[in-house]
């Protein structure tokens, strides 16, 4: 059985926050932010818009793109670190709001690696033969856990969502190879402070980890698929920081024109990062049927996940 993406959708809130916004209250500048991160702007959800709302918008698009009905979905997995509340989960909320029927629904927390973790998890369920259309969503409202007094992190994060339907696809298409992993010894470098409820990060340590793991994990899944870097049509890394992305690209041996860059428009959107990049490349025609692509993410935990896919239904 070939398992892959049968439907796709993405959503970013309408409100756009440019770098000039932060110049009003932080010792920073548009020039510095752009140079150090690659970010020019990010989308933030309104106060009355929560993670489940973002996830819903992306899910509706993915269901329509797959040509199925909500009742055809037999499982929902949502990757998020910013659920509306601890429980019910965002997946529970989607199950009710979409009208899927009383299917299994769960949130999966692997921070910025969450979308990769959830796609890999969904693949196993479909491969078992017991499930046929699994809705996987990566959605985060990072603006609600961003410390706007912290110059090192305040400028980095945005909000958004992406969704896919994982199921059986045509011969020769779908997920080819994958890996996921974690290193809990690095958990102290990127975490949600239990007292303030805000995100804290040791940027230097996270940078070193990210450059190494994104490049190495990508290389391993390419080799596992019996491919070389020359076979890759598009490299879609987690959009955390342009310098991390460029270093990972060089480590993998991919030319600059083959790397997706959307961090300039969205900032770091955690679990939504990779699907928002996919959305951009589909719309601009850079991602086409039968393209071989590499997806890779890293996040708090510390965690990582990577996969190669032959794109198409």
Curated annotation (Swiss-Prot):
GO BP field: fatty acid biosynthetic process
Protein encoded by which gene: fabH
Protein name: Beta-ketoacyl-[acyl-carrier-protein] synthase III
Domain of life where this protein originates: Bacteria
Catalytic activity: malonyl-[ACP] + acetyl-CoA + H(+) = 3-oxobutanoyl-[ACP] + CO2 + CoA
GO cellular component: cytoplasm
Assembly behavior: Homodimer.
GO MF annotation list: 3-oxoacyl-[acyl-carrier-protein] synthase activity; beta-ketoacyl-acyl-carrier-protein synthase III activity
SUPFAM superfamilies for the chain: Thiolase-like
Note on domains (UniProt): The last Arg residue of the ACP-binding site is essential for the weak association between ACP/AcpP and FabH.
Subcellular location per the Swiss-Prot or TrEMBL entry: Cytoplasm
Record: active site: 112, 238, 268
InterPro entries found in the cross-reference section: ACP_syn_III_C, ACP_syn_III_N, FabH, Thiolase-like
Described purpose of this protein according to its UniProt entry: Catalyzes the condensation reaction of fatty acid synthesis by the addition to an acyl acceptor of two carbons from malonyl-ACP. Catalyzes the first condensation reaction which initiates fatty acid synthesis and may therefore play a role in governing the total rate of fatty acid production. Possesses both acetoacetyl-ACP synthase and acetyl transacylase activities. Its substrate specificity determines the biosynthesis of branched-chain and/or straight-chain of fatty acids.
Major subcellular site: cytoplasm
Pathway: Lipid metabolism; fatty acid biosynthesis
PANTHER family xref list: 3-OXOACYL-[ACYL-CARRIER-PROTEIN] SYNTHASE (PTHR43091), BETA-KETOACYL-[ACYL-CARRIER-PROTEIN] SYNTHASE III, CHLOROPLASTIC (PTHR43091:SF1)
EC number: 2.3.1.180
Family: Belongs to the thiolase-like superfamily. FabH family.
Spans annotated as ACP-binding: 239-243
Disulphide-bridged cysteine pairs: none
Keyword set, alphabetical order: Acyltransferase, Cytoplasm, Fatty acid biosynthesis, Fatty acid metabolism, Lipid biosynthesis, Lipid metabolism, Multifunctional enzyme, Transferase
């Amino acid at each position: 059985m070939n398992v892959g993406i049968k439907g796709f959708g993405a959503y970013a809130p309408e409100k756009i926050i440019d770098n000039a916004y932060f110049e009003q209250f932080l010792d920073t500048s548009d020039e510095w932010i752009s140079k150090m991160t690659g970010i020019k702007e990010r989308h933030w959800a309104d106060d009355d818009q929560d993670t489940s709302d973002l996830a819903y918008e992306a899910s509706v698009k993915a269901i329509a793109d797959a040509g199925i009905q909500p009742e055809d979905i037999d499982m929902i997995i949502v990757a998020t670190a910013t659920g509306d509340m601890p429980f019910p989960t965002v997946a529970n909320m989607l199950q009710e709001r979409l009208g899927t029927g009383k299917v299994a629904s769960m949130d999966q927390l692997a921070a910025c690696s969450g979308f990769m973790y959830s796609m890999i998890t969904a693949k196993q369920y479909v491969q078992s033969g017991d499930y046929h259309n699994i809705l996987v969503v990566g959605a985060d409202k990072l603006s609600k856990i961003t410390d706007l007094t912290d110059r090192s992190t305040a400028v980095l994060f945005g909000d958004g969502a992406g969704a896919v339907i994982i199921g059986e696809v045509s011969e020769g298409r779908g997920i080819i190879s994958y890996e996921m992993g974690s290193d809990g010894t690095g958990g102290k470098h990127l975490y949600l402070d239990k007292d303030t409820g805000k995100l804290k990060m040791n940027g230097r340590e996270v940078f070193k980890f990210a450059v190494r793991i994104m490049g190495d994990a990508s290389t391993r899944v390419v080799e596992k698929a019996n491919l070389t870097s020359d076979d890759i049509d598009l490299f879609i890394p987690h959009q955390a920081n342009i310098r991390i992305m460029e270093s990972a690209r060089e480590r993998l041996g991919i030319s600059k024109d083959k790397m997706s860059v959307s961090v300039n428009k969205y900032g770091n959107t955690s679990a939504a990062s990779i699907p928002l990049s996919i959305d951009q490349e589909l719309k601009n025609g850079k991602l086409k049927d039968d393209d071989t692509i590499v997806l890779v993410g890293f996040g708090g935990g510390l965690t990582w996940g990577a996969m190669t896919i032959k794109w198409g239904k």
